[in-house]
Amino acid sequence: MIFQALAAADTPYQYGGQSHATGFDCSGLVAHVYRAAFGLVLPHNSRAQSKLGETIAREALQPGDLVFYNTQGQAYSHVGIYLGEDKFIHAPKPGSAVRIESMRGNYWTRRYNGARRIASL
């Protein structure tokens, strides 16, 4: 699964996108990775994804867990995939590309909403 996520690095952001060909938005990246790795069909919406699986405490995060942020003034408006060592991969915003970032940065720490582990894994 982490391989599929890392393979998306540097793919351009595209609202509504969920493939290497079209680009990715945040929830489209998550949906693509889970479909490619496990054959799971996840909703293409970060808030809907935030209701899947089980809640995970930040200190219990494992690679593959979903991490959620408030980036638009609403809880769970952004999602990424935890990679380990306080890093996650995500599709940040228009004009950017899929990239790895540290969860320790001030921007992400202040906006952290929680994490989920998809139960069927």
Whereabouts are the PLM-identified features?
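Solvent-exposed polar/charged
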Residues: 7, 35-36, 81
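Short beta-strand segments that buttress and anchor functional surface loops
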Residues: 65-71
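Intrinsically disordered, low-complexity
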Residues: 1-12, 117-121
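Catalytic cysteine-centered active-site loop
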Residues: 11-63
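Aromatic- and glycine-rich peptidoglycan recognition patches
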Residues: 40, 56, 70, 76-77, ...
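Structural motif
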Residues: 64-65, 86
